[in-house]
Amino acid sequence: MINDRFKIEVIKSSELSTFFQIYKPNIDYPKLQEIFSGTLELCYNQDDVSFTNVIHVCFDIKEQKYCALLNIGTTTDIDDIVSIDIEFLFVEKEYRKIHFEELGNIKLSEYLLIDYVVLTIGETIKNQIGINTVALTPATNKIRELYSSYGFQTIQGSGSKEAEDWMVFNL
């Protein structure tokens, strides 16, 4: 539980099919739908040890509905250094521009990226097993600018195309 308004749940791979019968993200861009489909394949493919992705969902207790989804795993795609990988972050449209008082007057996406992944998960993993970076690849340049304002840095030339360059947050 984050606070009285939101809680984050981890969905076990064995429960994904059942969960996505209950919650169908309202993905409003074709490119995001393509990324979402690809990211789900990573979660279902738990037999391959190179895939370590886990779905985390945010539930709005007040409104009694799911409002965001994260796919978090690990990657060695950046110079063979293990990083926490935010494979996918999706926030339902009606939650995107709101600064929530319950979250310290920040947007839900910022809370999920910085407070939840970087500060909660990232710091715990850093202290316990020594992974020191959180990595992601933004879907658009506009999102890249937003993540840059949160402290993520672009690693030029790290993607197959410039728009696919990795961004990292050093813990």
Regions found by a protein language model. Name each.
Residues 1-103, 111-112, 116-139, 144-171:
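Non-catalytic substrate-recognition and accessory regions of acyl/acetyltransferase enzymes
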